[in-house]
Amino acid sequence: MYQLLLSLMFRVPPERIHHIAFTAMKLVTRFAPLRWLVAKVLVVDDPVLRSQAFGLTFPAPLGLAAGFDKDATGVDAWGPLGFGFAEVGTVTAQAQPGNPAPRLFRLPADRALINRMGFNNHGAGHAANFLRQRRVTVPIGANIGKTKIVEAVDAAADYTASAQLLGPLADFMVVNVSSPNTPGLRDLQAVESLRPILQAVLDTVSVPVLVKIAPDLSDEDVDAVADLAVELGLAGIVATNTTIRRDGLKTPDAEVAALGAGGLSGAPVADRSLEVLRRLYARVGDKMTIISVGGIETADQAWERILAGATLVQGYTGFIYGGPFWARSIHKGIAKRVRAAGFSSIAQAVGAENPR
C-alpha cells in the first residue's frame, strides 16, 4: 500500500512532498484523541527495548535522525509515530535560507537521497520556542551547526550562541561538524579546530553533549576524534552523517553527476557507517555511547548495529522509503531478536559481537 503511495509521492518535487507529509504528521499528532490512536497503532511498548544512555531513559532504540524536523516544529509528533527519540535540527544561531532549490533529490534505484539543503532553518531562537512548549514524550536532542556567514575562527562563539538557547530545553545536544553542505564545515572535524568548539558547548550546557562525524573521515581521523571526545568527557558520538562519495551506485553515473553536489544518504552509506561504528566501539565503546546512523532500513540492519556496539540507532532516509510503519517494524524486529538471542534487555546485546 505504502509503495503505491510512495510512487505517487515521487511525482511531486521532494522538498514539497516533505512539507506536505510533515504537515500531515504534525496534524494527526496535534490533538489528544488522534495522538492516542496513532500511538496505539505505531508505538511498540516492550520492556526489552528500553535502555539507559548518558543519564536518559529511551523507551526504544530507533530515533529520528536530524534533518527531518529542522526547526523543532514537530517535536511532539515523533514519540506517537513510534520513534524512541528524535534529533531536531540542524539549527544554527542565526536564521538562514540554505542553498538555492532544487536541493533535495531522490535516487530510487539506490533507495537513497542526495541533499544540499545547507542548514536551512529559522534560527536557534525560533526552535527554542517550540522546544519550550513541548510535551514530554521521548528524549529530544538538539543538533547544532555553524551559521554559514560566520568565519571558522568565530565558530566556537556561534555554536555557543545556539547552545545557550537550546541547552536548557533539549535533553541532549549534538554538535554537527560533518555536513558537506556548509563550506568549510567538515574542516572543523580536525582535532585542533574541533577542540575549542566542543569545549565551548560543554562549558555552556548541563545536558549531555555528543559530536556527529562524517563517514568520509580517514580511519586515523576517526580515532583522533574519538580520543578527543573521551578526553573532553563527551557523552557520545553520532556516526555517521551523509557522504560525498558516489561510487557503487545503481543510478547511472550521468544522472548522478547531473544532480550535482550534496550529501548522499540511505542504503549506499550502510557499509561505511557500520565500519566506522565498529572502529569507534573497539576504541571508545567502554567510555561513551555510540549512536549509529546511515543506511539502516531493516530490523536486521538495526540489530547488526546494536551487536556491533550501537546503544541507539537512527534513520531518516529509511523512514522516507519505509513509510509510517517503519519504526514499528524495526522495533518489533529488534524485540524479537533480543529474545531469540537469550537476552533480557537490549542493553545486553550492545557490542555482543565483540564482548569486552
Swiss-Prot record:
Q: Which cofactor does it need?
A: FMN
What is the cofactor note?
A: Binds 1 FMN per subunit.
Gene Ontology molecular functions? dihydroorotate dehydrogenase (quinone) activity
Per its UniProt entry, what is the enzyme's top EC class, as one word? oxidoreductase
EC no. given is 1.3.5.2
Q: Which InterPro entries match?
A: Aldolase_TIM, DHO_dehydrogenase, Dihydroorotate_DH_2, Dihydroorotate_DH_cat, Dihydroorotate_DH_CS
Reactions catalysed, semicolon-separated, are: (S)-dihydroorotate + a quinone = orotate + a quinol
Which PROSITE patterns is this protein grouped with? DHODEHASE_1, DHODEHASE_2
Any single Gene Ontology cellular-component annotation = cytoplasm
Q: Which UniProt keywords apply?
A: Cell membrane, Flavoprotein, FMN, Membrane, Oxidoreductase, Pyrimidine biosynthesis
UniProt xrefs under CDD domains: DHOD_2_like
**Bilayer topology annotation:** Peripheral membrane protein
Q: Where in the cell is it found?
A: Cell membrane
Residues engaged in binding substrate: K70, N115, R116, M117, G118, F119, N176, N181, N241, T242
User: Which HAMAP family does UniProt cross-reference here?
Assistant: DHO_dh_type2
Provide the function of this protein: Catalyzes the conversion of dihydroorotate to orotate with quinone as electron acceptor.
Q: Hey, which family's this protein in?
A: Belongs to the dihydroorotate dehydrogenase family. Type 2 subfamily.
The entry's protein name is Dihydroorotate dehydrogenase (quinone)
Tell me the organism.
Answer: Rhodococcus erythropolis (strain PR4 / NBRC 100887)
